């Protein structure tokens, strides 16, 4: 899997969860203490989030890191 493919899957999972819980980019930015520009880049797939960003986003969205990154599915 390429980095680009990883980002695309990350975006898909984050945006689905955001819709499910009724969060927009601005709210996610505020709750994660990340700039709106950074969240926007993550959600456009133009920037790969750091591990700490993935952890932070997973906590805010109440998702496990495995659920958010699908690594759990890869090792089943």
Language model region names:
Residues 1-24:
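A short, Lys/Arg-rich alpha-helix, primarily the initiator
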Residues 16, 41, 70:
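DNA-binding alpha-helical recognition surfaces that contact promoter or target DNA
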Residues 18, 29, 58:
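The alpha-helix within a helix-turn-helix
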Residues 19, 33, 44-46, 73:
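Residue-level detection of the helix-turn-helix DNA-binding "recognition helix"
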Residues 22-41:
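Short alpha-helical DNA-recognition segment
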Residues 23, 49-52:
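Residue-level signal for the short linker/turn that defines the boundary of a DNA-recognition helix
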Residues 52-67:
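DNA major-groove recognition helix of helix-turn-helix/homeodomain DNA-binding modules
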Residues 67-76:
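Short amphipathic recognition helices of helix-turn-helix/homeodomain-type DNA-binding modules
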